[in-house]
């Protein structure tokens, strides 16, 4: 229900755009005795953006500078992703990082400040997050090609007893879906016409 809005695109069918925009939420930064420990969560966002760049879908890649309240460090997520992208061979001059953003709405504003309006972008985020993210970026005047990654669900081909046993993983996926539905509801109320 949450992930099904947009099908995954084949890269060769995607046109070149002004920028590839990789949304935050793919890692957690922990600081211990002035050393940083990076924990990957939804790394598919990062690697999906790199793949699009290497396939020459844009000359620019933007990492949003997510700085979540639980990351009590000086580094933003965008800064860390830029560092890793350079290590993976992306030209530093082709990488932009937005100012700090706490949520998807702030990410859309920060990208708009960098690019302006009426730009064509490929938006890279988790499948469950795409519907809300795409809507917010379109409201900022972007022409969005949705590139979904990090699918949390897969179709059940055959139902058997194992599928019916509750699991912590299923509970976690339910929590993600519930949070996303609440986020959609909130933004629908906020931006009613």
Stretch-by-stretch model annotation:
Residues 174-193:
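A transmembrane-helix-recognition feature enriched in membrane-embedded lipid enzymes
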């Amino acid at each position: 229900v949450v992930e099904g809005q947009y099908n995954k695109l084949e890269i060769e069918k995607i046109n070149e755009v002004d920028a590839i925009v990789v949304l935050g939420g793919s890692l957690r930064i922990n600081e211990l005795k002035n050393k940083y420990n990076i924990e990957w969560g939804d790394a598919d966002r990062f690697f999906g953006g790199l793949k699009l760049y290497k396939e020459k879908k844009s000359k620019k890649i933007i990492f949003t500078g997510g700085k979540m309240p639980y990351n009590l460090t000086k580094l933003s997520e965008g800064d860390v992703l830029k560092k890793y992208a350079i290590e993976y061979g992306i030209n530093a001059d082709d990488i932009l990082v937005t100012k700090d953003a706490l949520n998807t709405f702030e990410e859309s504003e920060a990208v708009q400040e960098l690019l302006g309006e009426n730009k064509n972008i490929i938006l890279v985020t988790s499948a469950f997050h795409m519907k809300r993210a795409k809507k917010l970026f379109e409201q900022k005047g972007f022409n969005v090609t949705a590139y979904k990654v990090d699918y949390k669900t897969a179709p059940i081909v055959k139902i058997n007893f194992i599928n019916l046993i509750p699991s912590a993983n299923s509970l976690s996926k339910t929590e993600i879906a519930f949070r996303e539905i609440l986020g959609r509801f909130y933004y629908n109320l906020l931006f009613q016409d």
